[in-house]
Amino acid sequence: MPPMKRFICLLLVAAASVSGTHAQRVTRDIPYATPHERQVLDVYAPAGAKSLPVVFWIHGGGWQTGDKTMVALKPKTFMDAGFVFVSINHRLLPTVEMGAITRDVASALGWVHRNIAAHGGDPARLLVMGHSSGDQLAALMCTDDRYAKAEGFPLTIIKGCVPVDADTFDIPAIIEMAETRARVHHLPLPTYGHRQKFGDDPAKHRDFSAVTHVARDKGIPPFLILHIAGHPDTTAQARRLAAVLQAAGISAKVVAGRETTHSSINDNIGAANDPVTKELFAFVADALKK
């Protein structure tokens, strides 16, 4: 069996394992920025870990709720496969504005780059992933290199990006679609929808959109964009981001989860025989070759 196929098979076997045999440890509530109860992260690592690739996970919750403990099978799945897994919290709307949230995520990435070696991770091999609102943040961190530069690390340490079912890679487009739909169907507009969450300013809407920042020769990593097959908005946004990435010469694959929901496509990552998990680990194996 060729070495890369063997590596993918080993990853998939580990991902499907329900009960790992290796000792694992978790270090919780590590501050990554100024003292705020939300500016903390958890590090999950196999015992004796050394220079392992790192999965950096951002929870969902509409930027208003959610927690770093919302990880389901992921920590064990990735540790069993030979990864360090990091899950972060960030401050939330409406207590802070969106820019504070994006800076929190960048600060957490900076902390990982500077400190993850002490936890057995390789600071030069990160995979950035997130669900729902977390994948808008993940995609932005992987395309807008101002965040990496502000934290003092090159974008090239991020070897892959995996957004899981979001509709906000192109924020002006989703705002227009949602508001047009409301007008056509005579529905009330939300009082705190995407327009308001992202600052009620078209310039900010563009700036918080991953598609705005895609360009050649920035070190943008390959993308695996996961979405549920049954939702037109996340489907359209996944295809939009992939098209922009591919036009810039950046590898991007879109995978639609069949018979899944917004919650289950996320919660089932790591489950035995989950098709999305198989796609994910095949992508990871390929991304880490580069």
Regions found by a protein language model. Give the residues of each.
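Absolute protein N-terminus
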Residues: 4, 23-24
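Alpha/beta-hydrolase superfamily serine-hydrolase fold, recognizing
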Residues: 15-16, 24-290
